[in-house]
Amino acid sequence: MKKNYSYKNIQAIDFTNLNDGEKLLVLEFRNHPNTALWMYSTFISLKTHLQFIEDLKNSPNHRYFLFKEEGVYLGVGSITKINFFHKHGYLGIYKNPFLKNGGETILKALEFIAFEEFQLHSLHLEVMENNFKAIAFYEKNHYELEGRLKGFISKDKEFIDVLLYYKDKKGYNDQSLLKL
């Protein structure tokens, strides 16, 4: 069984430990138009979703969490493509579309899991070049642009570039020291 984590008063519930209601809630968040718009595939069926969660039980390099704070579900965060030898992984977030905020709380908890619990050296992420809100969010949280995948995503008969961002443990530690 995969482990759940806590960061301050935030619970990170591993997808493999979700109850049936939480599984449906995650699917509702994921398929919400405001979330699906920025995903590589726009709609996920219940059958596909449940199979994905089942497959995660045998996938040590992919961790997905539902984040909860004081009974409120904030959204989902993931660390995927984890390479424990080279100590890096890919970060992903989608917040509860019915809440105004929550992304920053999820990000801080995910970074804690990645850098403190998993002892990773760096986190990487992909964001569509036209997702200005996400780009501003990650840059505000000290993620640095490291590259571009040209014409990587096909959406509405158009090819869109994907921007690559990263933060390493030094950037995480520097940011943590600023808050003391």
Curated annotation (Swiss-Prot):
Record keywords, A-Z: Acyltransferase, Transferase
Q: Which Pfam family is one of this chain's hits?
A: Acetyltransf_1
Q: Which GO terms describe its molecular function?
A: acyltransferase activity, transferring groups other than amino-acyl groups
Q: Which reaction does it catalyse?
A: UDP-4-amino-4,6-dideoxy-N-acetyl-beta-L-altrosamine + acetyl-CoA = UDP-2,4-diacetamido-2,4,6-trideoxy-beta-L-altrose + CoA + H(+)
Q: Which domain of life is it from?
A: Bacteria
The keyword Acyltransferase is assigned to this record: yes
Kindly indicate whether the keyword Acyltransferase belongs to this entry: yes
Q: What is its EC number?
A: 2.3.1.202
The N-acetyltransferase domain extends over: 13-169
Functional description taken from the UniProt entry = Catalyzes the third step in the biosynthesis of pseudaminic acid, a sialic-acid-like sugar that is used to modify flagellin. Mediates N-4 acetylation of UDP-4-amino-4,6-dideoxy-beta-L-AltNAc to form UDP-2,4-diacetamido-2,4,6-trideoxy-beta-L-altropyranose.
Protein's UniProt name: UDP-4-amino-4,6-dideoxy-N-acetyl-beta-L-altrosamine N-acetyltransferase
Source organism (scientific name): Helicobacter pylori (strain ATCC 700392 / 26695) (Campylobacter pylori)
Organism lineage? Bacteria, Pseudomonadati, Campylobacterota, Epsilonproteobacteria, Campylobacterales
Write the gene name.
pseH
